[in-house]
């Protein structure tokens, strides 16, 4: 099903890309846009994960440079029956995280330094379990390809303003068509992102809670991340808004309501769903992830440890 959705998504984005090309240069522009879109789809399939990681200047870590963080991901991947993904750290004060990769065998997870500094061990486990759920459901391919193509469509819409405003460029619609392309193309790309992101967050929350073994760990983390995202800006995300739907919580400023134009479901709705899940099941479907006590002698992020940052999270078996 996810493969079919991905194919339909790519087809829609390609048609949208061609439509903007038609506005810029008529039939010739449309054909050029088709060739470019086909090349981008092929390139994005193989390279979009590296492109997104590069956008955020993510640094890969291992069991030596970030033993606690790496150990959490390793244990959760084992719980989920997934191959070990590559593990990255993003230097950003805003607590957040995302997953990327075309399949579970070529996946990566990334957490910000702000997340590792401000969340407890249990909360980080809940967050990373959510990201592994996206990998298990193969959401990461669709999310990453969408981010790449949506960004390209937005740029092409802006490009139309400078080069498509007259009929001498084979533009059959003139300046009015350019204005439509500038407004409609980025908006349509954004709506596609919202459609694929909002429904998948709930399913990833539920599966993530099963992977880590306690829905309340994730619900506590979501509250903290959402609160911090309102006051701590993510400058890289603001420069690359097409990637916003990839994060566990919308990293952009100005997102408050669960409405048509939100890339994520309302946080309180997600928390309520997780709390219902916790009440329905006294124990998770898998054993709670437990820390590697030897690894906990070292810091997960250089010169930092696990901060409690406000209200205490639900206690884990090691607390």
From Swiss-Prot:
Its EC number is 3.4.24.-. InterPro entries: HtpX_protease, Pept_M48_protease_HtpX, Peptidase_M48. Keywords: Cell inner membrane, Cell membrane, Hydrolase, Membrane, Metal-binding, Metalloprotease, Protease, Transmembrane, Transmembrane helix, Zinc. GO terms for biological process: proteolysis. Zn(2+) binds at residues 130, 134, 201. Its cofactor is Zn(2+). It is found in: Cell inner membrane. The keyword Repeat does not apply. HAMAP family: Pept_M48_protease_HtpX. Belongs to the peptidase M48B family. This is Protease HtpX homolog. It comes from Rhizobium meliloti (strain 1021).
